[in-house]
């Protein structure tokens, strides 16, 4: 259909207003999308709002996108003046349709800096843009800028430090932002396979908003277990778990624990106790065992997926490095045998009975009953974990090759064995 320039302007202005009104009517919109519709069949708005879903009929995009794009460029070139409210509406519409338009994000940065927008509102727009374009690099880059600004806003000043209520509110604000960011990353990863941008952003969030937070690291390792089990070819998801294991190993290292002991919380309490040391020695062997067991289950259930073998290789290498550093850390001090040492040496023992293993466990740790944590107790209820080792990995490979009918699975198993012999076996 042929429209005059004036008619197009009126149409587009109405559509922009309809989008703005849709967000006012329902501030809980959580997804946007295009509705395939080659031409306008009815005399009605092309903006469709159903529950928390916002749809835009595709016929209007060819008019809408060039209009808002040109409007914003004219503003940046100082050829046309737009008030702040109009800028918010135009940039919102433009970024929902094309989130990789850097100029629009830069305009919103200026609006944030002058106080027209708040960080949470801008993060919400980015979340909606990612529901349609989950890999948009400009959106992820902008989110990091906004999160850094949010952190600065929540950093307590001298006066706020005296106001415990205000300090607590800012802390809760950051905590909500952290939880929301993890949800956004998970949703984007589910919408686009091997979404490197989403997983990289998730790592950035951990490094900048949850640095040294063991609870967040443990929760992330637990929450992504099911996800990777359902996406066995997603390299980025498994790489994220590798990052979590490395971060946990670093935070639970003796050097890190020493730093933790000397640090204090704002309330003056130490962040770690002596009982934590005993517990931390057992955490990493258990986590490595669980990760290797996860790899075993997935490799046997989904043969022929190279991602799983690559992940197993990386996890075993991390375990090998951690074990070597742990042994070197003991040095010549000849420390007393601990539960961890039993776990490390279990692979060298014959197949003793479960009751015998549990008796050894009780003897070794009988003097530490008062310092058990809940995780330690859970670990003690079963037999000692068989930790991954060079012999156990060769046994696993032999079992795979013996019963394997998938040529790709055999090729990956043989390659893994060569890697073990050439890298670990040296």
Swiss-Prot record:
PFTA repeats lie at residues 86-119, 121-154, 180-213, 219-252, 290-323. It comes from the Eukaryota. PROSITE patterns: PFTA. One of its GO terms (cellular component) is cytoplasm. Pfam families: PPTA (PF01239). Residues 255-279 are annotated as: Disordered. InterPro entries: Prenyl_trans_a. One of its GO terms (molecular function) is protein prenyltransferase activity. The keyword Lipid metabolism does not apply. PANTHER family: PROTEIN FARNESYLTRANSFERASE ALPHA SUBUNIT/RAB GERANYLGERANYL TRANSFERASE ALPHA SUBUNIT (PTHR11129), PROTEIN PRENYLTRANSFERASE ALPHA SUBUNIT REPEAT-CONTAINING PROTEIN 1 (PTHR11129:SF3). This is Protein prenyltransferase alpha subunit repeat-containing protein 1.
